Amino acid sequence: MGLAVLLGTSGALWLTEALIMPKASYAYTSRLNLFLTLEEDEPYSSLVRRANMAARAGAQRSFDQDLLITEVVINVTGENSDGIAVPVLSLRVSRQEWSQQPVTEYWATYFRGAAALLE
């Protein structure tokens, strides 16, 4: 009888602990790859402007949709009419950084050589 009481008590303690302490949640990084086409006679600066807007929307949407996301990495690739595709910008930002300053231009890395390759 002593063993049954001991096992019953430990089972009750385990059940109580499981109810009080929920399972641990894990934070993670959201990764997004976006592709934009450089339109006929469109200046490269316009493509960069569109890339900034797309990256900003992607980052905001990622943080809004999932509270466990702690960091967002977005790569924007541009493609010209000849089928040449090159990275235009890469945005890597934490939730805390984004909440303090949600500005793509502040956190993004721009690839300067992309303009020459796409035009």
Task: Locate each region found by the language model.
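Polar/charged, Gly/Pro-rich intrinsically disordered segments
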Residues: 27-30, 37-43, 49-52, 65-119
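N-terminal post-signal-peptidase region of extra-cytosolic proteins
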Residues: 53-62
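Bacterial N-terminal signal peptides that target proteins for export
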Residues: 1-14
